[in-house]
Amino acid sequence: MISKYECIFLDRDGTINLDPGYISSVRDLKFYDYTFKALKLLKPLTKSFIIITNQSGVSRGIIKEEKLIEINSFIHSKFLENALNLLDIYYCTDLPGNSSTFRKPEAGMFLQASSEYNIDLTKCIMIGDSYKDIVPAKNLGMSSLFVLSGNGKKDLHKFDHLFKPDHIAENLFLGAKDLIK
C-alpha cells in the first residue's frame, strides 16, 4: 500500500498533549484523551511520525535538558505501546528573541529531519496548533493541518486569504477523521 504522506510531522504541546505552560517532568505531560486514537486513524496514511517542538523552557532554566530527554523517551514509549512508528523528536531550546534557524517558524528542524531520514518534505504534512507550526510547512511545500486545541484559537486570526493551512480542525482527532476521508 502506498502511503498518502511519507511522514506526518507533529507539534507537541497543544497538539498531542495539553499545554499548561512549560512541562518540566514526565508527570506534567498529559496527552489528550483522543491523541492515540487520532494517531491510529492516521497510521494507514503514513510510514512514520516525527515530532518537531520548540522547548525554550530549557534556555529559560525552567527545565533541565536531561528532563526533556526523559519526557521524549516517555513519548517514544507511548508511541511504541500504540504500535506507532515515531522516528524522532526534534527540539529547539532557543529563546524566541535569540533564535537560530531551528526554532519554529524557521525550517531548520524540518530540514534536519529531511536530511537525516531522506524524507521528501513535499510529500509530508505538518499538524500543529500554532501559526509557527504552519509557516515552515507552507514554506517547504508541505501540507498542513491546523488544530484549534492548545494555542489554535488564539492563533487563528494570524492567517489571511493568501496564507492559510490546508486543513483546519477543532482538534487532532477531528482533523485525523477529515484526513482519512
Indicate residue ranges for each PLM-predicted region.
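Conserved hydrophobic residues forming the short capping helix/wall of the S-adenosyl-L-methionine
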Residues: 75-80, 114
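Active-site neighborhood of HAD-like aspartate-dependent phosphohydrolases
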Residues: 1-50
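Acidic, Mg2+-coordinating phosphoryl-transfer loop and its flanking beta/alpha structural elements
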Residues: 126-167
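A short acidic, helix-capping loop that chelates divalent metal ions and anchors anionic groups
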Residues: 20, 25, 57-62, 95-100, ...
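Substrate-recognition element of Asp-dependent hydrolases with the DxDx(T/V) motif
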Residues: 35, 39-72, 86-98, 137
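Short acidic-hydrophobic, aromatic-tinged amphipathic segments that line or gate anion-handling sites
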Residues: 166-171, 175
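Conserved Lys-Pro-Asp/Glu-containing loop-to-beta segment of HAD-superfamily phosphomonoesterases
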Residues: 101-134
